[in-house]
């Protein structure tokens, strides 16, 4: 399986109509935690098991991983969790518009593909359009949590969110002031990085009270 896929390739520019929350979940009114780039899904599987009164959605651009995650989820009979194949740059905004305002409580973006070359920066998952889609759906005090073991990438991500007026950084200054995953569950990459004694940079943003305007 390819580690990285180009989200700007023609195939991934085709918009997908994702299932609505009422189709995805038995209890569709529960608050939602959205994990962008859910990889092998262990992070969300553990969260969904621990917190049955939340709904969890994992979005992943690598379709074979989504199939693998869904197989695990069905085996565990987790009805508050779904993994969906999509390119968030193309399909996220429409799906979020189906949610009740404020239902989206948490968004996590953890160890995303770095795309190191400057000419490939536009392939990175986080951008102004995605942030605005999230801001439009999220009410005051909603969370965006990001983490990476690559300093240049976390700096790029924080700069991108800092420029967005709808989110306020919680841990200003030190990129290492959050010493563990705030959701008390680690991703596979997080576990790997800690075993290798790599530095992990974590930043939490809070949706402020500013009303969204186009």
Curated annotation (Swiss-Prot):
Domain of life according to the entry: Bacteria
Reaction(s) catalysed by this chain's protein: guanosine(46) in tRNA + S-adenosyl-L-methionine = N(7)-methylguanosine(46) in tRNA + S-adenosyl-L-homocysteine
Binding site for S-adenosyl-L-methionine: 35, 60, 87, 113
Annotated catalytic residues: 113
One Gene Ontology CC term in the entry: tRNA methyltransferase complex
EC number: 2.1.1.33
Record pathway: tRNA modification; N(7)-methylguanine-tRNA biosynthesis
Function: Catalyzes the formation of N(7)-methylguanine at position 46 (m7G46) in tRNA.
Family annotation (NCBIfam families): tRNA (guanosine(46)-N7)-methyltransferase TrmB
Protein name per its UniProtKB record: tRNA (guanine-N(7)-)-methyltransferase
